[in-house]
Amino acid sequence: MSSTKTPISLTIKLNQFTDKPTGLDINRYHNSPIMWRNIIKQLSSRTPQKLLFSSKNRTYSFLGFGQDSVFKDNTKFRSLIPISCSNIVMGFQNLGEYLPGDEFLSRPLLKNQVNSNDFCCRKSYASVAEAVAVSSTDAEEDVSVVDEVQELLTELKKEEKKQFAFRRRKQRMLTSGMGHRKYQTLKRRQVKVETEAWEQAAKEYKELLFDMCEQKLAPNLPYVKSLFLGWFEPLRDKIAEEQELCSQGKSKAAYAKYLYQLPADMMAVITMHKLMGLLMTGGDHGTARVVQAALVIGDAIEQEVRIHNFLEKTKKQKAEKDKQKEDGEHVTQEQEKLRKKVTNLMKKQKLRAVGQIVRRQDDSKPWGQDAKAKVGSRLIELLLQTAYIQPPANQLAVDPPDIRPAFLHSVRTVAKETKSASRRYGIIQCDELVFKGLERTARHMVIPYMPMLVPPVKWTGYDKGGHLYLPSYVMRTHGARQQREAVKRASRNQLQPVFEALDTLGSTKWRINKRVLSVIDRIWAGGGRLADLVDRDDAPLPEEPDTEDEALRTKWRWKVKSVKKENRERHSQRCDIELKLAVARKMKDEEGFFYPHNVDFRGRAYPMHPHLNHLGSDICRGVLVFAEGRPLGESGLRWLKIHLANLFAGGVEKLSLEGRIAFTENHMDDIFDSADKPLEGRRWWLNAEDPFQCLAVCINLSEAVRSSSPETSISHIPVHQDGSCNGLQHYAALGRDELGAAAVNLVAGEKPADVYSGIAARVLDIMKRDAQRDPAEFPDAVRARALVNQVDRKLVKQTVMTSVYGVTYIGARDQIKRRLKERGAIADDSELFGAACYAAKVTLTALGEMFEAARSIMTWLGECAKIIASENEPVRWTTPLGLPVVQPYRKIGRHLIKTSLQILTLQQETEKVMVKRQRTAFPPNFIHSLDGSHMMMTAVACRRAGLNFAGVHDSYWTHACDVDKLNRILREKFVELYETPILEKLLESFQTSYPTLLFPPLPERGDFDLRDVLESPYFFN
């Protein structure tokens, strides 16, 4: 018997459902003789760098199933955190792929990669003792090894308990505190919403048709739904005929291979709803461009085909698995019992990464723009052939019925600036009777990207995150190929800060404020016209004058044109409100819902749902509140009063914080009256600048003040902290500009500085000086005299706000001209134009004086962009959070494709960049990438501090009780952001990317101390 000590490598197949391992596989290995002691030492170590298995890793992740395992094809244990096998000292290498824990047991085994030279499954033993007895000839070594193995098993058991607790904590985080069963129920509903919306609509139409045809019932349907129902059957049948030709190979059309991939009824519903949606929301209401409509419909069909194919594939895979299960009766009873448990787990958890699974398992290629356009065009053509409309029956019985097409296809010619040039494009125009019904269409429309019932899937890649099934992309690239490729190339680690921020924004739970919604519904049912709601009736057209006077008739025609334009705008607003209310009504009975977020190319975050979200108008913000309520506390009660004053506005928001509190307390009777009798009482809330948000706060504040303990009253209201002309705040911080910093509240003051009033005061000083000059020598003196009494903050506000976007002289002139025209102070058009030119010049001069550092930085950024773009390169940079940005401005080329409806002109990027656009757009885009970074940094810090957070670019929201914490965090993050050498890094990146180009030196910076921001109460307020 040899006494030489031989190291033993051990594979333990842990049974997750029992306390004991099912067996031990032992093979001799040639590594360290003190291997077991090293393992125990590493397992028990508390130093993170030395842990072999941290508390976040499954202790048996490295333990693969044997080759004869009954689970080999069905199951694989996975690590909660990907780890490198090379760090494992047990003699095993590369035993398998490590997957995230939230996908644990969620899909079949991906092939284990086992190095047969390093690991051999030769024989199994009933116990540790038997294994050691067979493998060792030294008695002392036997005892030593058994003791060490038992110690190892004890440590593994402890570690598994830790993992169980960790998984429970993670599950609670995943389900947002709603409980596992409730979460799964809501998740299944969410999957149905995303995957069955079109199918359910088609089913509803088929059931209505059955009621009409088979049971001789005429359903009492809303006007628009009756139109849909009338169009549905003939369109479905026409599509089915076309599909039959395609499937039999009788159609040689380019769209043939795509047209039969979806049931005809679903295609019919998608075509009707998408076209009507475009007619509602397009710029010219009642018409839609053919190319846009074709692409939108084609894209919707492709998305639904992918979901449909995946669901069909899933059904087949399930059937195959069920058959395999029936054939596996030879396995032991214990193994069968264990397999059933694993199968049940898989069933319960198979939806965990459903969005990613769809994209991972769907190996079909994207259709491309040409295919989408051809499919969409053919479906539009079929709708044109089958959709008709008949006016109400008010004709004489002897007259033939007036049945006419619901949609018309025509060509519109648009003249360009030069009379010799013009362009033509095809449009789809709906009949007047259809147009009148568009406003009532919203509540019957299928809206696929609804708010989610469960938290969005966490972002892990360009197209991995957001919705469960619906295609979701982390960035809105709008076809910009280089931008899309830049994001895809970026590593997950580089983008992790952005992903984490988007996950934070998406995890905020919202609900509908039913009391405010009921008030909106009452106003809307009464015809609108209150609280900034548009009039539901059109303005009457002026009567035609009974005269041959051409001057009077010309004036009448202009008035008719003006009223028609106003009515189109009213129609557009009514459609928009109907869509918002349709979503609010659908979600009003939900306990809560979530908005998945993504970013634009600059890194600004937006909710993916387009209609009812907190970035929207006052009506949206008024009906949205946090689903979680928190006690106000003393601080929260104070901030709720300040928030009410801010919403009332009208100059109140410019008072000190104490002044705003006093304003609210002085109007408590009005607040109570508004809460109790919003429409029957004095209607004080209607005087607010944001009336519906004001009403929501009136209701909440009334409940709190009237309660026995206002501080313990629960509040769901998001309280806003808004930046003061935030773009100029970022410029002042970049340039360390003391004068600019004081103007935009980067330093403390007794009350908030108003940059617009400051600029207006400077403009007035210049104009008063100019008014004293001799008009013969200075012609603008006359204009200065005419404008002296017109200068106020409203006149210059838009120009000051857009100055950070690089507003040009022409842009400023047009803005000021609109303000002057609204006031009617200057009647003559030529005099109005001259006055606007002069006022714009003076306003830009005042801006340059007050924000000299901002102007110099803006100029430097523009010069750098011009140098780069002159080399036919787009301007690129990386945001402080690691997001790669590529400006998308390239010259657009035309690509003609022939469809069954018409020849379509598709736009596509060329290789030639637009030098001027690259230069003028870079300064505002760069600043927006910085304000987006600040918001994301604040969002993540708030989540870690336990705050609910929502953001609207330069407006940060949280519960009233947490506003003080939010204020501290957002100031700290602003200072943290600008303490990094942002401009220096930008210049360095330019010089590295373009070593042969010469860039101008950085502009000089001032002496402003960034730490002053921490003590400024009105920086955000």
UniProtKB/Swiss-Prot annotation:
Residues 315-337 are annotated as: Disordered. It is an enzyme of class 2 (transferase). It is found in: Plastid, Chloroplast; Mitochondrion. The active site is at D722, K797, D954. It catalyses: RNA(n) + a ribonucleoside 5'-triphosphate = RNA(n+1) + diphosphate. Belongs to the phage and mitochondrial RNA polymerase family. This is DNA-directed RNA polymerase 2B, chloroplastic/mitochondrial. It comes from Nicotiana tabacum (Common tobacco). The lineage of its organism: Eukaryota, Viridiplantae, Streptophyta, Embryophyta, Tracheophyta.
